[in-house]
Amino acid sequence: MKLPKEGDFITIQSYKHDGSLHRTWRDTMVLKTTENAVIGVNDHTLVTESDGRRWVTREPAIVYFHKKFWFNIIAMIRDNGVSYYCNLASPYIMDQEALKYIDYDLDVKVFADGEKKLLDVDEYELHKQKMGYSSDIDYILKENVKILVDWINNGKGPFSQSYINIWYKRYLELKNR
C-alpha cells in the first residue's frame, strides 16, 4: 500500500470491536505520513454516523494516528484555545479504501484550560461484556490511558502548542495554494 502524500485527501473509518462500522470522516487532508504515523486535518469535514446521520466538523482539527499506540488524538483549534478529544483505539491500518481503526469507547477530553476528563467508562464496561474484549485488550487500553495522560501532562507531540502551530500553519499553506 502506497502511503498518501502531503495534501492528499483520505477517508477515515472507525469500527467497533465486533467489526461494525462506527463513524466515517470524508476528505481528511494529509499533512504528513511516516512509516508509523499519520498527521492530518479535518476542517468542515463530512462525518457519517453508523445510523446514517451526517454532520460537518465545526472548526479545524489536527488529527494524529499512530501504529504503535492504542489511541488517536484530535486537537480542535478554537477561538478560546486548543481542546483535545482522544479516542482509546487500536493502532490504525491503512488500505486502498481508508485509514481504519477500532474505537474502544474510552475517551479523554482535554479542555482549553488544561482540565482533563475520562469519558464513557460505562459504555466501555458495557461493550467490554457485550463484545467480549479480552483481558489483554483491557490491560493494553488501561496502560495506554496512562501513556496518553503522561503525554498530556508533559506537552508531548500533539499536546505541544508548537506542534499545533507548525501543523496548522502547514495546513493553511496547503489550503491556500
Curated annotation (Swiss-Prot):
Enzyme class: hydrolase
Residues annotated for Mg(2+) 1 binding in this entry: N87, D103, D107
Protein EC: 3.6.1.15, 3.6.1.6
Keywords: Hydrolase, Magnesium, Metal-binding
Catalytic activity from the UniProt record: a ribonucleoside 5'-triphosphate + H2O = a ribonucleoside 5'-diphosphate + phosphate + H(+); a ribonucleoside 5'-diphosphate + H2O = a ribonucleoside 5'-phosphate + phosphate + H(+)
Pfam families in UniProt: DUF402
Active site: R23
Alphabetical list of PANTHER family matching this protein: PTHR39159, UPF0374 PROTEIN YGAC
Similarity field: Belongs to the Ntdp family.
Name of this chain's protein: Nucleoside triphosphate/diphosphate phosphatase
Organism: Streptococcus mutans serotype c (strain ATCC 700610 / UA159)
Taxonomic placement: Bacteria, Bacillati, Bacillota, Bacilli, Lactobacillales
